[in-house]
Swiss-Prot record:
Lineage summary: Eukaryota, Metazoa, Chordata, Craniata, Vertebrata
InterPro entries the UniProt entry points to: TEX47-like
Gene name as annotated: TEX47
Entry superkingdom: Eukaryota
Known tissue expression: Testis-specific.
Name the UniProt record assigns to this protein: Testis-expressed protein 47
Annotated TM spans: none
Length: 253
């Protein structure tokens, strides 16, 4: 398409090109604006994803477990700058599986809070917590909010694979199933919904991890508890020995 512009003789007025250029700029709708705003908000800090397992007392109210985490998340974000926590908490009869997504500093504070309760209380209702894996600098969240689901599947319907598989096979099944479940929930749940609720074993029974695997990982010595991880986290990478103190000071690369 071409445009012909006729100037009057002797006229020095600039051509009205601004309206033409303005029409060529794509306009974004309000939804696109909100999505871009959310994307920029989530990029304030580098995001990490952490997988935790732990045992809980059989007589503890499932609501108490969920309330503990909700109140703790609010307290951490109130006193420390960081990203909001999103993820999934599966509460089994005697154990929990927790997937958390947030900034590293926020996840660090979550572990410290658990350590504080274990030290200060005679018997804390969450016990034998183990860190299975931490993924650093993840490109995006799988969960846009934090969800809780109580699993009420009878043990008799779940096969105990821990008796016939090696630790490598068990952890492979654990990571595979949890990632499949996370992707499924990411694709099916919309922002603002309450989440899967307590019927997850009916909605996605094939993606549900047997409780025996969680309890098996809680007892495994190959995985760190929060206290051991925090001690390693705070330990300096390079330790200077007395024999290394020379002048000029050596440089490390």
């Amino acid at each position: 398409m071409s445009f012909s512009v006729h100037n009057q003789k002797g006229s020095k007025r600039p051509l009205p090109l601004e309206p033409l250029l303005f029409l060529q700029v794509p306009r974004s709708n309000y939804l696109h604006f909100q999505e871009e705003k959310q994307r920029l908000h989530l990029k304030k800090f580098l995001l990490d994803r952490m997988f935790l397992v732990a045992k809980i007392q059989a007589n503890v109210e499932r609501k108490d477990v969920a309330d503990y985490y909700e109140q703790m998340f609010q307290s951490v974000l109130k006193h420390h700058l960081g990203e909001a926590v999103t993820g999934l908490l599966l509460i089994y009869p005697t154990s929990i599986l927790h997937i958390l997504e947030s900034s590293s500093d926020t996840l660090y504070k979550v572990l410290l809070d658990y350590i504080g309760h274990v030290k200060d209380e005679t018997v804390f209702f969450i016990q034998q917590m183990k860190i299975i894996v931490i993924s650093h600098n993840i490109p995006m969240r799988l969960f846009m909010q934090w969800h809780v689901s109580v699993i009420k599947v009878p043990v008799m319907y779940l096969d105990d694979v821990t008796q016939s598989q090696s630790l490598k096979e068990v952890i492979t099944d654990f990571l595979t199933q949890t990632h499949k479940l996370s992707l499924y929930l990411c694709q099916t749940m919309k922002v603002g919904t309450k989440g899967p609720g307590d019927n997850l074993h009916q909605v996605a029974p094939d993606l549900l991890l047997p409780e025996q695997i969680i309890k098996y990982l809680c007892k495994s010595e190959e995985f760190m508890d929060p206290a051991t991880f925090i001690n390693m986290y705070n330990r300096p990478i390079h330790i200077t020995l007395d024999s290394e103190v020379v002048w000029p000071a050596p440089s490390r690369f």
